[in-house]
């Protein structure tokens, strides 16, 4: 899906904005000390405050404020000197109080941006700045489980788990600057990456730690007014975000071209059927009857505290990507892969700091090491094969002490147990044969054992050199220096 989609009636442009709900990784909830542990038995992490029982008062968790401000700083948002909490009124079974504590007209932060690298299919990767309207704090709702349906309508009965109710959220609202499903997915991915680098959220979409709602409309041309906006929910992966946007763009275009109206509504993404379906009409902010929460005072973050938090921010993914390209000469792709996960980036930098060449380290991490880590669901921070041990192995390869083939053979043991590649090589006699005299002797023995192939080579069948290289590697157990072996073999085959 491109930014402008051609049709019989001209070019259509999609206008997309995202509301990203990030669960902040505090041990207790936003206004009470109830636990935030995921996956425990239903309704075991609730208390009178969560349930809104008479006589209870909420108290803001200071760690929530710190995490929200740090997230806002990383998104280049302006931190408000004063902000407040409001009550968002609506009735639904997942809200025990019948209102949600959120922030309406005075959020903690406004007017920011991030830049995302977008790799559209068939196009060069491009950089795009996406505006961010605001970040505000709020409490999460409980979770409904509908028997016999994926929503309330059509279910035989519903169960509610309030363990999630009251968990702290940072809602990040983008400006309508996105134009394709791919841009939307890349934006959401970068938001999660930043939150993980900060350590304020694990961003696990399967557990609901990061949830995105898409607001999308289409218009005929970049100068046309916005069309009717539709909200899409129920996307639990970046791929689903992209596909939902692409489907909805086409659905709206077809509706307009058929003379039908596009209704302002909330729709659900159906992963199985790969389509969006109507859920309910979309409420406006006036429907929620916001008013300041009388139980919570205004929020003021003093300058000294704010700047103290700023000094604790890590180097962010975009800065790392740029530095890796400049400092280490890595490609855009390599820099992107290595910085996708904070622990992977730290592992890479530690190996390079131990003296290994950056490109070699990058190749091993992105290949065999990443495959092992992902297959075994491990973390780079706890991997037995430490960065300095990887650096030693890469240095052995670059120094001609072992071949890449030998490194691959010993790597599984190193990944599982850790240890020194040099010690294993020395103990098992796996070092590369780089003595010209020794290789010359082996080459001469091979040529003497295959006179017909030698004659054929000298008769013009030069591809037979590959046969001799294979025989040489087989005879030496893959330990012959490939460059030197090819050089001597070529010389001897030509009669030298």
UniProtKB/Swiss-Prot annotation:
Its EC number is 6.3.5.-. GO terms for molecular function: asparaginyl-tRNA synthase (glutamine-hydrolyzing) activity; ATP binding; glutaminyl-tRNA synthase (glutamine-hydrolyzing) activity. It is an enzyme of class 6 (ligase). It catalyses: L-glutamyl-tRNA(Gln) + L-glutamine + ATP + H2O = L-glutaminyl-tRNA(Gln) + L-glutamate + ADP + phosphate + H(+); L-aspartyl-tRNA(Asn) + L-glutamine + ATP + H2O = L-asparaginyl-tRNA(Asn) + L-glutamate + ADP + phosphate + 2 H(+). The keyword Lipid biosynthesis does not apply. GO terms for biological process: glutaminyl-tRNAGln biosynthesis via transamidation; translation. InterPro entries: Asn/Gln-tRNA_amidoTrfase_suB/E (IPR017959), Asn/Gln-tRNA_Trfase_suB/E_cat (IPR006075), Asn/Gln_amidotransferase (IPR018027), Asn/Gln_tRNA_amidoTrase-B-like (IPR003789), GatB (IPR004413), GatB_C_1 (IPR042114), GatB_Yqey_C_2 (IPR023168), Gln-tRNA_amidoTrfase_suB_CS (IPR017958). Keywords: ATP-binding, Ligase, Nucleotide-binding, Protein biosynthesis. It holds the Pfam family GatB_Yqey. NCBIfam families: gatB, PRK05477.1-2, PRK05477.1-4. Heterotrimer of A, B and C subunits. Belongs to the GatB/GatE family. GatB subfamily. Allows the formation of correctly charged Asn-tRNA(Asn) or Gln-tRNA(Gln) through the transamidation of misacylated Asp-tRNA(Asn) or Glu-tRNA(Gln) in organisms which lack either or both of asparaginyl-tRNA or glutaminyl-tRNA synthetases. The reaction takes place in the presence of glutamine and ATP through an activated phospho-Asp-tRNA(Asn) or phospho-Glu-tRNA(Gln). PANTHER family: GLUTAMYL-TRNA GLN AMIDOTRANSFERASE SUBUNIT B MITOCHONDRIAL AND PROKARYOTIC PET112-RELATED, GLUTAMYL-TRNA(GLN) AMIDOTRANSFERASE SUBUNIT B, MITOCHONDRIAL. This is Aspartyl/glutamyl-tRNA(Asn/Gln) amidotransferase subunit B. It comes from Prochlorococcus marinus (strain MIT 9303). The gene is gatB.
């Amino acid at each position: 899906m491109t930014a402008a989609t051609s049709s019989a009636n001209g070019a259509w442009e999609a206008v997309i904005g995202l509301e990203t709900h990030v669960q902040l990784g505090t041990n207790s909830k936003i206004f009470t000390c109830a636990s935030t542990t995921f996956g425990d038995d239903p309704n075991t992490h609730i208390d009178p405050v969560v349930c809104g029982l008479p006589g209870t008062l909420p108290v803001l968790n200071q760690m929530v404020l710190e995490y929200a401000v740090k997230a806002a700083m990383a998104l280049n948002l302006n931190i408000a000197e004063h902000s407040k909490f409001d009550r968002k009124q609506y009735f639904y079974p997942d809200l025990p109080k019948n209102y949600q504590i959120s922030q309406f007209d005075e959020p903690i932060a406004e007017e920011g941006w991030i830049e995302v690298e977008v790799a559209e299919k068939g196009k060069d990767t491009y950089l795009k700045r996406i505006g961010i309207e605001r970040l505000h704090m709020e409490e999460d709702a409980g979770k409904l489980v509908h028997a016999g349906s994926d929503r309330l309508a059509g279910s035989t009965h519903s169960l509610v788990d309030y363990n999630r109710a009251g968990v702290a959220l940072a809602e990040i609202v983008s400006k309508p600057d996105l134009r394709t499903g791919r841009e939307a997915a890349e934006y959401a991915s970068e938001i999660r990456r930043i939150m993980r680098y900060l350590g304020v959220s694990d961003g696990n979409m399967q557990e609901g730690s990061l949830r995105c709602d898409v607001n999308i409309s289409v218009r005929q041309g970049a100068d046309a007014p916005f069309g009717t906006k539709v909200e899409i929910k129920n996307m639990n992966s970046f791929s689903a975000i992209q596909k939902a946007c692409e489907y909805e763009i086409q659905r709206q275009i077809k509706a307009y071209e058929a003379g039908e109206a596009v209704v302002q509504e909330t729709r659900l993404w159906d992963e199985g059927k790969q389509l969006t379906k109507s859920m309910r009409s979309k409420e406006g902010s006036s429907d929620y009857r916001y008013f300041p929460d009388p139980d919570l005072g205004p929020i003021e973050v003093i300058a000294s505290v704010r700047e103290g938090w700023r000094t604790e921010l890590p180097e962010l993914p975009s800065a790392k990507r740029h530095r890796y390209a400049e400092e280490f000469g890595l490609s855009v792709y390599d820099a992107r892969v290595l910085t996708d996960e904070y622990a992977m980036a730290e592992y890479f930098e530690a190996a390079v700091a131990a003296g290994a060449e950056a490109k070699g380290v990058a190749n091993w991490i992105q290949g065999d090491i990443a495959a092992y880590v992902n297959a075994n669901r491990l973390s780079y921070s706890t991997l037995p094969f430490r960065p300095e041990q990887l650096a030693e192995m890469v240095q052995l390869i670059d120094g001609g002490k072992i071949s890449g083939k030998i490194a691959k053979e010993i790597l599984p043991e190193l990944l599982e147990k850790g240890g020194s590649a040099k010690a294993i090589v020395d103990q098992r006699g796996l070092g590369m044969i780089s003595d010209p005299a020794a290789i010359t002797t082996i080459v001469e023995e091979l040529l003497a054992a295959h006179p017909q192939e030698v004659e054929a080579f000298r008769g013009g069948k030069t591809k037979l050199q590959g046969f001799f290289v294979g025989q040489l590697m087989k005879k030496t157990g893959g330990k012959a220096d490939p460059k030197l072996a090819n050089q001597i073999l070529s010389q001897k085959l030509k009669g030298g």
